[in-house]
Amino acid sequence: MIVPHRLKTTTSRNVIWDYSYKHDKINRTEEGDLRIVRFAIQGKAKYGVIQGDNISSLRGTPFTGFAGPGSSLALDGNSYQLAEVRLLPPCLASKIVGLGLNYRSHAEETKFSIPAVPLIFIKPSTAVIGPDDEIVLPRFFRRVDYEGELGVVMGKKAKNVPKDRARDYVLGYTCVNDVSERYAQKEDGQWTRAKGFDTFAPIGPWIETEIEPDNLKIETYLNKELRQSAYTADLIFGVYDLISFISGIMTLLPGDIIATGTPSGIGPMNPGDVVEVRINKIGTLRNFVVGQK
């Protein structure tokens, strides 16, 4: 068992996390960020924090007692090597709230008008898969597209949250691939079937806490070829606007994810493909595309 004195931090403009292990807790009192991971070891799912090539596991979940800046995370005293665990979806979302046409470039490539208010839809929790899991294309599929996106992970229950308080409700950020069947989307006139198939919501590889979401570079690669590239500064509706808007419609629960929309460059995937969503300061979400057996 490895119990480090201090986790490596990266600087941020805000007062965020202290990683010193004091009485089995990590206290959020200094600048820096924290990488939270969910993983499987010996048939059990656990949450932990990453330090180098090791994971220090948590007692319970990162949502337990989360109250925004100033919260702490309780450790259970165990440490594991990254190589010996399997990474899981980084949280258990009750729902994923997706955004359509939230990049000007994507609205232009699809020949839709810029929306006056956020265009939202729901992806079910049964669509969620984790890093290195398989995206399974349905038997009848005609065109299934990748959509690389920034995901916002809610840290606590949010209802009618004003924009200037929205940051206090965010646990962190992750990568999302909003997989979509284009013909079903066109035929139905609404998006539930097109975006709701099992495995159509890859998320991961972990949750990066307290980074600034307003100028992150997001890229999508298909078979190592760059297909999408943009900055979150180009979002039509920013992260805190979205939290305020969505929480005024529905209650967001701890672990829920807001998928903030995809930039231009969407395109089809086929069995045998490998798709990667990369966001600087977060990491890479990789998945393998297969046909339904």
Regions found by a protein language model. Name each.
Residues 159-173:
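N-terminal accessory regions of nucleic-acid-interacting proteins
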Residues 130, 145-147, 253, 270-271:
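Residue-level recognition of short, solvent-exposed, well-ordered loop/turn junctions
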Residues 113-131, 146, 276-281:
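Structural signature of FAD isoalloxazine-binding scaffolds in flavoprotein oxidoreductases
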Residues 2-4:
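N-terminal amphipathic/hydrophobic targeting modules at extreme N-termini
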Residues 30-118, 211, 219, 225, ...:
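N-terminal non-catalytic cap/leader segment that marks the start of a structured domain
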Residues 131-151:
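A structural-propensity feature for long, helix-poor, extended segments
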Residues 79-80, 90, 106, 182-293:
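Catalytic-pocket segment enriched in acidic/His residues
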